[in-house]
Amino acid sequence: METVKGYVEHIVFRNEDNGYTVFNLNNDDGDLTCVGNFNYLSEGELVEVNGEYVVHSIYGTQLRVLNYEIKAPEDLLSIERYLGSGAIKGVGASLAGRIVKKFREDTFRIIEEEPERLAEVRGISERMAREIAVQVEEKKDMRKAMIYLQKFGISTTLAAKIYQFYGPKTYQVLEGNPYQLADQIQGIGFKIADEIATKIGIHSDSDFRIRSGIFYTLQQSVAEGHVYLTKDVLLRRASALLEVEIKDIEKYLMDLSMEKKIVLKESEEGLRVYVSHFYYLELNTAKMLHDLNLEYEEANVVIEKKIHQIEKEAEMQLDEKQENAVMAAVRNGIMILTGGPGTGKTTTINAMIEYFHSENMEIMMAAPNGRAANRMTEATGWEAQTIHRLLEVNGNPEEDENPNRNGFARNADNPLETDVIIIDEMSMVDLPLMNALLTAIVPGTRLILVGDCNQLPSVGPGSILKDLIASECFPVVMLTRIFRQAQESDIVVNAHKINRGEPVLLDNKSRDFFFLKRQDPNVIISVLLTLIQKKLPKYVNAKPYDIQVLTPMRKGLLGVERLNSILQEYLNPPEPGKAEKEYGDHKFRVGDKVMQIKNNYQLEWEITTKYGLTVDKGMGIFNGDMGIVTEINTYTETLEVEYDEKRKVKYPFELLEELELAYAITIHKSQGSEYPAVVIPLLSGPRQLFHRNLLYTAITRARKCVTIVGNDQTFQEMIRNTNEHNRNTSLAERIREFCG
C-alpha cells in the first residue's frame, strides 16, 4: 500500500452517479494520475491518498486509491487555488486571490472564527461573507461525516447518500436509531443497519430493532411474491431473523398498525398482516377493475355479422370459442383470453384488432417485457411496446407515494388516450405494474388481458391473472382446441400433455422435442456445450447466442451460476484485446450475454445511428431484460450493454451488481420470452420447486426445438407434481367485494 500526499491539480473525469474520479495529483515528485471513488473532491485541495500502483494499457501508471483524507491547504497558493476552484459558490479565482492577499495564512481561521471580516475584501458583502463561512463549515462537516460512516463499512457512495439525506443530523441518526437508514435510504436494508447497530452497541431486543425486523420480514415476503403473511407465519419468521422470542415481538404489530406502516385484517385463515403500501395497491386495483368493467349495448347478431365479414375479408376462420372471445371483447370493458400454445390466441387477437379497426377505434398493445412486445408485433403486424414504455416511465414507481402518479408520465392526471388496450403475457404482470396500468386507463376504455394461466406467476408480488379469473367477475374465454398446424409440433402437443398431467413419450422420434438421458452433471454439461456449439445452430438456423439454457435452480452443479461460468468460457473465451471486468464472483467480457436482475427506473438508455447521432432516449431497464456487452471502458469505469431495439445503456462499474451472465437463466426468468431452441438440464431437485408448471413454462419458451438432458424419472415426476408454491394474495376477494 502506497501513501502519497499532494494537491489536486486537475480533475480529468468525474462520474456524478458513483463518485468515480480521475485526477492529477501534484506533489514533490511531480504529477501522478489517481483513480478511485471520491465524493466532493475539488481542484486545489490537499489530499493524502492510500492505494496501489497499477499500469493501464492505454493511460500508463496510475494510483488506484482505496482510501483518502482531505487536509487543510498548507501554503498560500494552495489556499487561493482551493477557494477559487468552484468549491465555494460565488468565489472565483480573482476574488479568491483578494481574500488570500488580505488574510494570508490566517484565511481559514478568519472564515471559521471571524467570517464577518471577509466583508473587508472588495466585492464581498456581509451577507456573502456569512454564506462563504457556511459553505466552508458544511464541507468540513461533510468530510468528517464521510470518515465516520466509512468506519462502519459503508461505501463512499452510500455514505454520500446518507449525508445528503440527513446532513448534520447523521451522527444523531446513527447513534440513536440506525434502523431509520433501512426505511429511508435506498440501498441500505435491515441487515446493513443491523450491522451498524451491533457496532454501535444497540441491544438485540431494542424496540426499533424489533420493529424494523418485523417490517423487513414482510418486505422479504413481498420479494417472494406474497402480498401478506398470516400473523403466525410472520412472527415465526421474524423471531428466527431477530433471535428474539415470539412473545416479545407480537406486541409491536399494533404499534406498526397505528403508525400505518402495516395493515392488520381478519380472515378465515387468521389475522393477515400486510405492508400498508401493498394492501392499498390491492384495494385500489380491485376498485379500478370494477370501474372499468362496463357492459356495452350491442346486439349479438350485429357483432356476429361483423365477425363473419372480418373472417371473409382477412381470410381467417374462427371456432366458436374464438368468436365468443371477440364478442366478449366488444361487449365488455374487461375480458380475459387465456389458453396454452397452439390454441389460437394470436388469431383471436388479430380478429379483435380487425373488428375494432373496422369501427375506427384506436388500439394500443403492450406486454411486460421487450421480447414479449416484439413477438406481439411480429404476430399481429401492429406495433406493441412494453407496459413501461406505454406508461412513459419518468421516475421510480417503487418510491413514488402518490397513487395518481406511480412514477409514470401516464397516470390518472394524464391518462392513455385510446379506445382499446390489449395486454399480452399477463401471467408476468405483478401487482404494482397492474395498478400503474389501471391508474392510466379511464372508464370507457376496453381492456383485453391475454395470457396462459398455467405459466409461472410474475417475479414481483401478486398473482394477477389467476386472481382475476378466480374472482369470477369478468368474462373469461379459455381456448383449449389445438389447431391442426400446431398439432404437428411435439412442443405444443407435449406441453398440453404436461399441463393435463399425462406422461410424455420420450422415444426421440420427434422433430422438435428431444430427451437425452444422462445422470452425471459433468456429462450433462458436456452435452449442453456440444448442442449449443455444434448441433443446434444448424438445426434451427440460429446463432449459439440465440439458444437458451433454462435451468430450475440458481445454485448447484446444474445451477445458473455454475453453468454461466462454464458456458462463458466456451462461448466467449478471453482473447488478447478483448476487454473484461471482474466484479464480485462475476467476470464480464465484451460480447457476453447478460441480464438485468432488478428494476432500475433511473438508468438512461439511448438509441444512436452508426454515426453517433441520438435518435431516441429514455429511462428504465427492468428485471429480466437481456442484452449484449458492447464496450468495457476501464478509464471511465463504465460497461455498455445493448438491449433490444438497439437501446444502449452505460453502467458505472458500481452498478454491475444489477447484471449477471445470461447464457443460462432460471426458468422463472424466461417468462414472456421465446427462443429458437431451448436446452434444459434436469436432475433431481426439491419437490416444491420441481413441479408441473415449471416444466410447462420451460418447454413453451421454445419456438423450434426443445432438448432436455438429464434424468427421465425426474421429468415424469415433475409432470405428476402439482404442488406449486401458492402465493398469499387477496385480490380476488377484494374484487368480489366491489362486484357485490
Pin down the residues of each PLM region.
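N-terminal pre-P-loop "Q-motif" helix
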Residues: 315-331
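C-terminal accessory regions
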Residues: 500, 616, 623-740
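Accessory, non-ATPase domains that flank or precede helicase/AAA+ motor cores in DNA-metabolism machines
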Residues: 1-305
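Hydrophobic positions on the alpha1 helix immediately C-terminal to the Walker A/P-loop
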Residues: 348, 352
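Conserved helicase motor core of SF1/SF2 NTP-dependent helicases
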Residues: 355, 359-361, 370-377, 388-395, ...
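Pre-Walker A (Motif I) flank of P-loop NTPase domains
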Residues: 331-337
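Conserved lysine of the Walker
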Residues: 345
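Conserved helicase motor core of P-loop NTPases
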Residues: 453-619, 738
